[in-house]
């Protein structure tokens, strides 16, 4: 149910967009106002697994209040004039899932953006490139002995969790503006509680799931956001090729990849 919002300017057409909770559509339960096709969010959660992934974002914030929950510090304030909550979740899926649930329960965020770095799963995706999630899944979930597909969580119909299309389209547009020299890919991101640095493991993930990038948090964030009917997007800059060269590549390109991801995230907030 919704009530139309009147606009004093004929050129600015506002409307309430009602989101339902059907699990196959991944629509928001919250009401957002939409103007000229752009979502206007009241509060946006930004998650990075490591301090390096959120430090530069926090430096740009104003009017900051810090709230501690579950050994995580949530920085609540404004960024580019928008209300945000920025947090370092810690590495791994349990940390990431807990962090997302706290953002939903305590701060009532209306969208979640996960920024960070990842390994490439696609030969066309090179170090420094950006991958925007179409969907996310757990590559290390294995309950095939109970009749489920590999990657599928038992007692859940969903095999993967779809990211928000509007957020993804905005990110793709923004990336071309702020990082025109960087290639942007839209595709599946696979998550597991392991750093992939073995080509045989990488090849097995590709064979089973496809995908464009592999990392350690996105699927947990996507699952928690999905179950709370909150739109999400995972933004990953590629730091390594997820093979035998991964450790060497990661050390060399980590900070440059983080810079790309942070730059894109901040500009997205500006336009939301």
What is each model feature region?
Residues 37, 41-101, 107:
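N-terminal short beta-loop-beta anion/metal-coordinating cradle
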Residues 22-40:
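Short, Lys/Arg-enriched N-terminal segments with co-localized hydrophobic residues
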Residues 194-243, 247:
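A C-terminal functional module that forms or caps the active site or interfaces directly
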Residues 121-209:
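Mid-sequence, gly/pro-rich, charge-dense loop/helix-turn segments that line enzyme active sites
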Residues 242-272:
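His/Asp/Glu-rich mid-to-C-terminal helical/loop segments that flank catalytic regions of hydrolases
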Residues 1-17:
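Single conserved hydrophobic/aromatic residue that forms the stacking wall/gate
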Residues 102-106, 124, 223-231:
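Alpha-helix C-terminal capping segments
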């Amino acid at each position: 149910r919704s009530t139309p919002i009147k606009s004093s300017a004929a050129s600015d057409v506002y409307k309430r967009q009602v989101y339902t909770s059907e699990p196959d559509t991944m629509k928001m339960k919250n009401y957002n106002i939409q103007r000229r096709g752009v979502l206007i969010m009241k509060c946006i959660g930004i998650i990075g697994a490591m301090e390096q992934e959120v430090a530069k974002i926090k430096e740009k914030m104003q009017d900051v209040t810090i709230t501690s929950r579950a050994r995580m510090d949530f920085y609540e304030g404004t960024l580019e004039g928008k209300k945000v909550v920025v947090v370092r979740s810690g590495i791994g899926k349990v940390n990431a899932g807990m962090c997302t649930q706290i953002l939903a329960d305590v701060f009532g965020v209306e969208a979640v953006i996960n920024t960070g770095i990842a390994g490439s799963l696609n030969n066309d995706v090179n170090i420094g490139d950006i991958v925007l999630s179409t969907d996310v899944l757990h590559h290390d979930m294995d309950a095939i002995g109970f009749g489920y597909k590999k990657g599928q969580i038992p007692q859940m119909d969903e095999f993967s969790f779809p990211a928000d299309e509007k957020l993804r389209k905005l990110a793709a547009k923004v990336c071309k503006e702020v990082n025109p020299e960087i290639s942007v890919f839209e595709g599946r991101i696979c998550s597991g509680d392991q750093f992939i640095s073995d080509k045989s493991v990488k090849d097995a993930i590709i064979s089973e799931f496809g995908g464009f990038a592999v990392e350690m948090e996105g699927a947990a964030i996507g699952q928690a956001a999905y179950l709370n009917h909150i739109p999400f997007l995972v933004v990953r800059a590629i730091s390594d090729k997820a093979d035998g060269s991964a450790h060497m590549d990661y050390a060399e390109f980590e900070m440059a990849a983080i810079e790309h991801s942070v730059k894109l995230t901040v500009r997205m907030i500006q336009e939301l």
